[in-house]
């Protein structure tokens, strides 16, 4: 099979979960004997992302603000304009491929891709109905469904006119996205994401949609295998809004067991502030590390914590901890409860209702050794286990 993966996130040296998923899946398809290319950005060095196949650097669509911040409202024309241009670019490169698989940030692009094109897209976040892709505002999860409420994310005091214009933009975006999902195959990385979109567009036709989770490369993870270090707690991710690092440290720093050592791996706009307030003999912020270094730290952890206060769709960080057999603590939000099915042993993934309850759960987990498990047993989110599901969907 000839597959063209498409993503605006590639190439990139610091890949998030979406970019890692695309590269992992594309390399697995290559290993299985398929012909794979990635259509990505013109800028950047393709070699740094780890893809072993042909890279087509053609996406040059910058995403300027279009003065939305200055105007205090969302522009109804902006996102459809970008989607049309990306669809035209896809059309220019789709010839000769059996599947064109888009992983990106413009879910409405499928509404502009010809019905005859074998187009599939994967939705990795809440950007199907939320223009900031996160559904998180004012330090809390946003459950608003009325498009007028979205004006509050682009300006602090939108007023009736700005609310109306923003609502036009959001409603149009959601309608075109629903049209894209009805027109072409769509993968959601969790059932949570599928349900979320249905809440925003109850009449959406999702009969062609399927849930296929994010994946990890089990062979690569096993190569980093190490014994857990007693008391070592590892947190990894971008230190940004919604990821919960600040809330976790605020709740935990004064209550750490004496033997506990916390390593926080990652960069982002919040790192400097966290380092100023919380760095100590027990708390280390390493900054960004490459993937293999981060996985090696995870393998040495006695406990992994994913403190996201936003609703994660399908946390690759949680999957990596589970794959390595490490106990993992997270909040019971978003798609994370769906990951219980990937536990190596009962109780491996513990879900807390609040940050205070999550912190309470640390000490008992640190007091117990990491349970033994069969590292050779198949892991359900290993790319080699998931690949047949993807190929079946391609062929459907």
Label each PLM-derived region with a short phrase.
Residues 342-356, 363-369:
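Conserved acidic donor-binding segment of nucleotide-sugar-dependent glycosyltransferases
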Residues 353, 367-395:
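A charged, aromatic-enriched C-terminal amphipathic alpha-helix characteristic of glycosyltransferases
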Residues 272-292, 296:
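Nucleotide-activated donor-binding/catalytic signature segment of Leloir-type glycosyltransferases, i.e.
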Residues 198, 207-231:
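Acidic anion/phosphate-binding donor-loop and adjacent secondary structure
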Residues 20, 231, 235-254, 269-272:
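A conserved mid-protein helix/loop that constitutes part of the nucleotide-sugar donor-binding site
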Residues 299-313:
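Acidic donor-binding loop of glycosyltransferase active sites
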Residues 303, 327-332:
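Short hydrophobic beta-strand element within catalytic cores of glycosyltransferases
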Residues 127, 139-186:
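Membrane-proximal helix-turn-helix segments that form the acceptor-binding/catalytic region
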């Amino acid at each position: 099979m000839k597959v063209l993966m498409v993503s605006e996130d590639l190439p990139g040296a610091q890949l998030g979960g979406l970019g890692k998923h695309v590269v992992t899946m594309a390399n697995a398809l290559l290993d299985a004997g398929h012909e794979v290319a990635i259509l990505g950005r013109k800028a950047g060095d393709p070699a740094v992302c780890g893809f072993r196949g042909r890279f087509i650097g053609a996406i040059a669509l910058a995403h300027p603000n279009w003065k939305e911040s200055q105007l205090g409202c969302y522009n109804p024309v902006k996102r459809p304009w970008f989607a049309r241009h990306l669809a035209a670019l896809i059309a220019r490169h789709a010839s000769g491929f059996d599947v064109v698989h888009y992983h990106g940030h413009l879910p409405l692009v499928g509404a502009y891709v010809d019905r005859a094109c074998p187009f599939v897209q994967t939705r990795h976040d809440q950007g199907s109905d939320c223009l900031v892709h996160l559904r998180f505002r004012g330090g809390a999860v946003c459950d608003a469904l009325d498009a007028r409420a979205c004006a509050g994310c682009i300006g602090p005091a939108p007023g009736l006119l700005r609310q109306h214009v923003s609502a036009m933009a959001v409603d149009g975006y959601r309608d075109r996205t629903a049209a894209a999902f009805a027109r072409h195959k769509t993968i959601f990385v969790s059932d949570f994401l599928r349900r979320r979109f249905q809440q925003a567009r109850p009449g959406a036709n999702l009969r062609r949609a399927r849930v296929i989770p994010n994946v990890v490369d089990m062979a690569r993870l096993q190569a980093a295998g190490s014994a857990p270090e007693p008391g070592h707690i590892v947190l990894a991710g971008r230190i940004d809004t919604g990821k919960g690092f600040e809330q976790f440290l605020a709740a935990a720093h004064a209550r750490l067991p004496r033997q506990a050592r916390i390593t926080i791996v990652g960069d982002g706009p919040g790192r400097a502030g966290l380092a100023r307030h919380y760095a100590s003999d027990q708390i280390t912020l390493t900054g960004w590390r490459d993937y293999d270094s981060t996985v090696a730290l995870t393998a040495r952890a006695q406990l992994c914590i994913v403190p996201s206060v936003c609703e994660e769709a399908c946390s690759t960080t949680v999957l990596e901890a589970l794959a390595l057999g490490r106990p993992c603590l997270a909040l019971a939000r978003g798609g994370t409860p769906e990951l219980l099915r990937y536990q190596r042993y009962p109780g491996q993934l513990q879900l807390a209702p609040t940050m205070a309850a999550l912190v309470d759960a640390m000490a008992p987990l640190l007091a117990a050794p990491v349970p033994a498990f069969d590292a050779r047993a198949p892991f359900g989110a290993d790319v080699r286990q998931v690949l047949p599901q993807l190929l079946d969907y391609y062929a459907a």
